[in-house]
């Protein structure tokens, strides 16, 4: 189990993600982003790549998909907030989205 992010960790690790469009969730220690893809196949392929890593990490996103849009929220339930696992998964998600041809 990774500990909850410290204030210093937040400054260091969340800034690059917020620059890429990740938002802090109001009223909750979590981050959220919506991705838009060319079509459903691209969105589903992206979700599959993310799911494979999430399963290896035993850290699963909250997500919602309609056609070419995927909304993702990350938080670590075991520490009731953000942890390094969320940072690692969000960073991978960014790379996977680029590879899946976001629109």
Swiss-Prot record:
This is Probable pterin-4-alpha-carbinolamine dehydratase. Involved in tetrahydrobiopterin biosynthesis. The keyword Lyase applies. GO terms for biological process: tetrahydrobiopterin biosynthetic process. It catalyses: (4aS,6R)-4a-hydroxy-L-erythro-5,6,7,8-tetrahydrobiopterin = (6R)-L-erythro-6,7-dihydrobiopterin + H2O. The gene is Pcd. Pfam families: Pterin_4a (PF01329). Its EC number is 4.2.1.96. It is an enzyme of class 4 (lyase). The lineage of its organism: Eukaryota, Metazoa, Ecdysozoa, Tardigrada, Eutardigrada. It comes from the Eukaryota. Belongs to the pterin-4-alpha-carbinolamine dehydratase family. Keywords: Lyase, Tetrahydrobiopterin biosynthesis. InterPro entries: PCD_sf (IPR036428), Pterin_deHydtase (IPR001533). GO terms for molecular function: 4-alpha-hydroxytetrahydrobiopterin dehydratase activity.
